[in-house]
Amino acid sequence: GGSDRTAADLGILFHKKYDTVIDLEKDSSVVSADPKIVKDKLDAVNELSYNEARLAGMFGMKIIDPIAIKEILENGVEIPLIITNMKSPEMITKIQRKPEDRSGHPLKIVTGKKNCAILRIESEMIRDLLTSLDKDKRYSEFIVLSPFTKDGIEFSRILFLDGDYVKRNEKYILSFDPLA
C-alpha cells in the first residue's frame, strides 16, 4: 500500500525530467485470480490498463494499491508500472494507460469483495453527492454503475466498496436523495 503510493508519487514528480518507469518488486506478478483461493490453473496476466488494475484492486486484488494508480491518472501522466515477481524475475505484469497487446481473452482477472453496498439515486442528484464525497468526505472507494430509467425517471447506481461506510454515513448520503 504505502510503498506503491510512494513509488507513484516519485514517478509523478520525476516524469517530466526523466523517462520514468515504476518497477514494483512483489511476491508474485498479477495472476488471473487470488492464489489463496484458487490453487490450480492460474494464468499469468502480462498486461493491464490503468483502469483494469485500479478496478481489480478496488475489488480485492492485493498486488497493487488502487490509489497509486488513481494518483497517476489524476495527474495525467503516462508512467508504465512493472510488477516483477521476486522469485521469478522473468514473470512480469506491465500496467499502462493502453496495453500494447489487445489479443487474447478479454476476461483477465476474477476478484471478489465482501461488504459492499449499492445506492440507487436519481441521476440529477448524483453529481452533488459525488462532488461532496470527493471534496468534503475525501472518499473515493466507489464505482458509478450504468444508469437506468424507471417510470420516466433516470436513476444512477453507486457501488460502495465499504458497506460499513454507508451505514456510518447513512443520514449524510440520504440527504442528497431521501428516497434513495
Per-region residue spans from a language model:
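C-terminal catalytic "cap/lid" subdomain
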Residues: 1-180
